[in-house]
Amino acid sequence: LTNITTIIHSCSYSLKEPLSPHAAAEIEGITINPDTIKIPNSNHLLVEMAGGLMVPFNNEGYLFSDFLVQHKLPTVLVSRHYLGSINHTLLSVELLKKLKIPLLGIVFVGDEHKTTEAAIKKNANTSNFHRIPITSSLNTSFIEKEALKLKGSSFLKNI
């Protein structure tokens, strides 16, 4: 995002409500058809799916995890510390393993929580971890600072 070669592709669906896609789409009176979502041809591509692997795209039972399988997309999980985050993160790791979706690493968001992270690291199917802080303003300065930390890191080399 901080260089001239980064391309931000348009969203196939842009929903107004901060809800799961199936719920937001229903409010807006549209149906999400995952087959209309085209994956751009790119050397480096990040597809963001907020909410979790079991979040439905639509009311037809098509989940984010189905999309990952269909398009053979390896995954980086994002984990934020809260009561239940160990369980949620490790359940996601297990689902990825069951569906044979490669887990490239886990990014922890927020302050370090040693016991939580130790439990996840011990039981996750990866040894590739990274941390980014929580920010109140996602801007170019924040992105540049975090990108510099990531550049050359073992996390990036392993994905």
What residue spans do the PLM features occupy?
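N-terminal phosphate/diphosphate-binding loop that engages ATP/GTP or pyrophosphate donors
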Residues: L1-I30
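C-terminal lobe/tail of nucleotide-utilizing enzymes
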Residues: V93-I159
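Switch II (G3) loop of P-loop NTPases
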Residues: T36-N59
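A general structural detector for well-ordered alpha-helical segments in enzyme core domains, enriched
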Residues: T36-I37, L63-F67, S92, T116, ...
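Class I SAM-dependent methyltransferase SAM-binding "motif I" and its flanking Rossmann-like core
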Residues: S85
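Inter-motif core of Ras-like GTPase G domains
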Residues: N58-Y82
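Structural motif
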Residues: L46-E48, V76-V78, V107
